[in-house]
């Protein structure tokens, strides 16, 4: 079982969309996937629950609210969810730096943090890296945080200006981005469809946008498998 946490202290950067695309790609490969949604907005859950009713390969979990700010309580609550064996676990987090995200960072094998060529999003990755360092310290891990963090560069629509070029170079040079995914209208609207790409094509939807989404999903899953040599 591999545990992947999608995280950034900056909200609205596309964590839930990337998490869903990743799940979509893994499901098409025949993997058994569990999603854990720690974002109070529940965006990933809203996409996944209808699919889980149709596919036993997808499991959806939401951690019950814990009033305590104890790291140990949140960490142990996640451990309890992970007791049911699956091939992959994908954790979606809120755009914050609360104790739930700290636990999600501590429990995972890999952190994926999306960023476009915007200073606020790059700073969100940098803050997430520092928070990951804190999380690893909490569990006594000596793994270097940079070894666990992978940045997915999200290429915006239109032509980038000079500042965007600078930010893109920073993302690749400093963080070593693993992918370049185009923020197309099809991908950004993916969560609202509440079905997998394969289901949408089978249902008779225009295949073109879904094939683009599948290509993006495949890039993500190939990157994941490359990280773990699986």
Predicted regions and their residues:
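Hydrophobic anchor at the start of a short beta-strand
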Residues: 32-33, 89, 111, 146-148, ...
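Inter-motif core of Ras-like GTPase G domains
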Residues: 100-119
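Conserved Walker
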Residues: 17
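Anionic-ligand binding region
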Residues: 123-152, 161-170, 174
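Pre-Walker A (Motif I) flank of P-loop NTPase domains
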Residues: 1-4, 160
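P-loop/Walker-type NTP enzyme "switch/lid" segment
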Residues: 3, 7-9, 13, 21-90, ...
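NTP-binding/hydrolysis catalytic cores, primarily Walker-type P-loop NTPases
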Residues: 197-230
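Beta-strand-loop-alpha "switch" segments that mediate conformational coupling across diverse proteins
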Residues: 154-200
